């Protein structure tokens, strides 16, 4: 009998058991967009599948020039320059090779903000001379704790502030109130880690 993770096709449902990553690791092409359930008047197209040395992709963001930045699960960021109609990749380049599992990417305020889960921190990357290379990396906020439910997505608020979403593997920052139900304290007195937004 074939192993469950080798069974084609890779279709993910609402109640998937979180094993799709194992099944996806055996595929050579991304999921067929024809299998997606989309709202009316929306469409999905496959532009590119991950190449052999590009690993698994965990997040993406577009810069002001329409280039796509993709974070690899292990480490590093890849930038794809797309054709004018956005249907082909014209250029592929590594723009960072040391930040680990960047689950959150956000272009804002002339910089790329990166929530690097396995690097345990939020960073700002800047291109200070306009040559397309991030030549300045600044640690903005380090966080202790695990990585399973770790440092996740970033969002730009209507107030132009950047919000980082952290899961319950990450320790609460000092001075932050724990707003979980006081009833659960009877069974679990205090946890250093709790899901939060900073």
Show the residue positions of the predicted features.
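Beta-propeller domains with acidic blade repeats across secreted/periplasmic ectodomains
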Residues: 1-198
